[in-house]
Swiss-Prot record:
Keywords: Aminoacyl-tRNA synthetase, ATP-binding, Cytoplasm, Ligase, Magnesium, Metal-binding, Nucleotide-binding, Protein biosynthesis. It comes from Pongo abelii. This is Phenylalanine--tRNA ligase beta subunit. InterPro entries: aa-tRNA-synth_II/BPL/LPL, B3/B4_tRNA-bd, DNA-bd_dom_put_sf, Phe-tRNA-ligase_IIc_bsu, Phe-tRNA-synth_IIc_bsu_arc_euk, Phe-tRNA_synthase-like_B3/B4, PheRS_beta_core, PhetRS_B1. Its cofactor is Mg(2+). Its main location: cytoplasm. Its EC number is 6.1.1.20. GO terms for biological process: phenylalanyl-tRNA aminoacylation; protein heterotetramerization. Heterotetramer; dimer of two heterodimers formed by FARSA and FARSB. It is found in: Cytoplasm. Belongs to the phenylalanyl-tRNA synthetase beta subunit family. Type 2 subfamily. The gene is FARSB. SMART domains: B3_4, B5. The lineage of its organism: Eukaryota, Metazoa, Chordata, Craniata, Vertebrata.
Length: 589
């Protein structure tokens, strides 16, 4: 979830009242948000860089608020305040309007060359806006939040904001060879070619993460005004000539990208959030975008649409019994202007341009549940019998895990996938004899097959912890996978218990004693009768000759124990003797 940092006092001033930390935390919870942290700029720097670096930093209290990833309208102070005020019914949701300019409309002309790299662009103008330092900071921060969220780190959409009074339209969005693009980028003192900029920004902590988007392309996107002044080279950097400041009065906004829908959403969010500060509140000046095919379209769309949802559907999905009128009121509090129409069971909802997250009826139902309050929904027993019970094999696993730990062994959780070498070559077995399930297109050599034994995972864990004090006593109780043509999926899982003892001496007696303890816990007595267990001398390629035994219990073979062969130990990069035990616990249910 994205986190929005807002100044507490500025937030309370905008909300028109002061809250205690506990009260504001409760308000956030009611609105479906979470107050994640109460901190300050000084405290943040102190934690990350130390007290010396924090000297002189601001002590202003900051609220860090977790916002749902699809609520782009809450990524800045303006949207957050507006949403909370509507939720508390202190104000009505504003109506956003697109207006035509008094004079000539600003045009953005897209050329055919952009189709090879970033084919889409939209634009708009915020006219007669009044910034303060805090408003300006919020404007810049919203762009960054959108870049990291819906824009997918500028891969889908990149935002450019420019001082319109320093430019002359119409504007041209085209693509050129890097060597043909030259301009003075933001915060630089001289001009550079695009090639030079890409080299410079490879060491820039902020911009280096975006270079890969275009650096290997033959053409780079660029936007010019009618005088040939570069506005920006999206998605990397804006030009310094048109940089905006606190004193900027007219802003030209362009959004370029590879996703047309998201570009329109991003533009709508920016202009709706900050048109509040325009001379004519909540009005946005239109801009015309001319596409390569000659067709033109006016942006921003600021489209309102209406959806119909039945009241009984909301009640059923949420588990409440509210009248259609009350449900309409709840939805209106969530920035979704609603009214009851028709037969009295239909609710008409107006979706504003700020709520791009409303895609389906279930999104409307969710907002109704939030406004009603999850804590107010009564707990009820389901109409169908759905009482769960623990799976017997998992219950046995949990009991054994606790007792293995009580015996002094440390639990390890290893990957279910491994390399062919781990389960075959290193254990002295041919891969065809393992009945392993193979991954058709493994992304790495470490994940080629599903494990057929837990032993390699534990030995690799020991290898990664060789510096730890001896002895190392590890165990794992997890599934292995074996091919089985008799099952519908062609494979079957078996729950295995594996334990290893690694020390200067093999410690076979410790592993043997552990086996006796496990059988005692499973209520299996020693003996060759049908209900007992016995170990018999055996051989295995992974074990030292004459130091291996097969375990029989309840009339069947359930596993092996013994001292590992020196070759196995060496192949897993170990240097000390090691004993192991591995059994199938399924037959003991």
């Amino acid at each position: 979830m994205p986190t929005v940092s807002v100044k507490r006092d500025l937030l309370f001033q905008a909300l028109g009242r002061t809250y205690t930390d506990e009260e504001f935390d409760e308000l956030c919870f009611e609105f479906g948000l979470e107050l994640d942290e109460i901190t300050s700029e000084k405290e943040i720097i102190s934690k990350e860089q130390g007290n010396v670096k924090a000297a002189g930093a601001s002590d202003v209290v900051l609220y860090k608020i977790d916002v749902p990833a699809n609520r782009y309208d809450l990524l800045c102070l303006e949207g957050l305040v507006r949403g909370l005020q509507v939720f508390k019914e202190r104000i009505k949701a504003p109506v956003y309007k697109r207006v035509m300019p008094d004079g000539k409309i600003q045009k953005l002309i897209i050329t055919e060359e952009t189709a090879k790299i970033r084919p889409f662009a939209v634009a708009a103008v915020l006219r007669n806006i009044k910034f303060t330092k805090d408003r300006y900071d919020s404007f810049i921060e919203l762009q960054e939040k959108l870049h990291q969220n819906i824009c997918r780190k500028r891969a889908l959409v990149a935002i450019g904001t420019h001082d319109l009074d320093t430019l002359s339209g119409p504007f041209t969005y085209t693509a050129k060879r890097p060597s043909d693009i030259k301009f003075k980028p933001l915060n630089k003192t001289k001009e550079y070619t695009a090639c030079e900029l890409m080299n410079i920004y490879k060491t820039d902590n902020h911009l280096k993460h975006y270079l890969h988007i275009i650096e290997n392309k033959p053409l780079y996107p660029v936007i010019y005004d009618s005088n040939g002044v570069v506005l920006s080279m999206p998605p990397i950097i804006n030009g310094d000539h048109s940089r905006i400041t606190v004193n900027t009065r007219n802003i030209f906004i362009e959004c370029t990208g590879t996703d047309f829908t998201k570009a329109k959403i991003v533009l709508d969010i920016i202009v709706t959030m900050f048109s509040e500060y325009c001379e004519n509140q909540f009005t946005v000046e239109a801009a015309e975008v001319v596409f390569p095919n000659g067709k033109s379209h006016t942006f921003p769309e600021l489209a309102y649409r209406k959806e119909m949802v039945r009241a009984d559907l909301i009640n059923k999905k949420v588990g409440i019994r509210e009248t259609p009128e009350n449900l309409a009121k709840l939805l209106t509090r969530m920035y979704l202007k609603s009214e009851v129409i028709g037969d009295g069971n239909q609710i008409e909802i107006e979706i504003p341009p700020t709520r791009a997250d409303i895609i389906h009826a279930c999104d409307i139902v969710e907002d109704a549940a939030i406004a009603y309050g999850y804590s107010n929904i009564q707990m009820t027993l389901p109409k169908t019998y759905t009482i769960a019970n623990q799976f017997p094999l998992n219950k046995l696993t949990e009991l054994l895990r606790h007792d293995m730990a009580a015996a002094g062994f440390t639990e390890a959780l290893t990957f279910a996938l491994c390399s062919q070498e781990d389960i075959a070559d290193k254990l002295g077995v041919d891969i065809s004899a393992t009945k392993a399930v193979h991954i058709s297109s493994p992304k790495t050599a470490e994940f080629q097959v599903a494990r057929t034994t837990l032993l390699p995972g534990l030995l690799k864990t020991i290898a990664a912890n060789r510096k730890m004090p001896l002895p190392l006593k590890l165990f794992e109780i997890s599934d292995i996978v074996i091919k089985d043509s008799n099952t519908d999926v062609g494979a079957k899982n078996y729950r295995h218990l594996c334990a290893v003892y690694y020390n200067k001496n093999p410690g076979f007696e410790i592993i043997h004693g552990l086996l006796d303890r496990i059988m005692q816990l499973l209520d299996v007595l020693p003996g060759e009768d049908k209900g007992g267990y016995v170990i018999k001398a055996s051989e295995g390629p992974a074990f030292f000759p004459g130091r291996c035994a097969e375990i029989f219990a309840r009339g069947q073979s359930v596993g092996k124990l013994g001292v590992l062969h020196p070759d196995v130990i060496t192949k897993f990069e170990l240097t000390m003797p090691c004993s192991s035990l591995e059994i199938n616990i399924g037959p003991f249910l």
